[in-house]
Amino acid sequence: VNLLAVVLSKAFVLLLIEVAQAAILTVGFVNVVHVPQNHLLFETDVEIFITVLLMLFASSATGLLVSAVFRSGETAILVVLVLMIGQVVFSGILFTLTGAASAIASVIVCRWGMGALGASTDLNSRLAWLKAGFVGPMYDATVANLLGCWQMLALIAAVCIVAAWLVLQISFDRRKA
């Protein structure tokens, strides 16, 4: 059994579904919210689509890793619940993260997704009047920030897919021996 092919085929099928999901979410969001165009790399609508797609794919890759590590469905659901709470707590949206919390946030999908969405929509300048704490490098409306966020989302996805394959391969090899 070629476990890499199994993991990659699952990831590919998920990606195909997520392209449709990202398109639906983006079109719905853009039509309801009327997002101002910032045009860092592409039209803001396209940047939002790419960000949502990368967030969905990185989240699915994390799910693949969880399902590879935990054989029991009940355990996997509990782990996913903890991961979902972590997405909110370590996203950098609720409060400023420092120290260990900042380090944990560096592997959180939501943190990089929110950073990319904030960069695409120039969240810093658009919400400055609120003084809501959104001003910061996380939401800098720069090409470098946007690309950095996208790269981190892609890296998280790649690491999770490779880790899922390695976990399955090690488990398979142990059962064979």
What are the roles of these predicted feature ranges?
Residues V1-A177:
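Membrane-spanning alpha-helical segments of multipass transporters and channels
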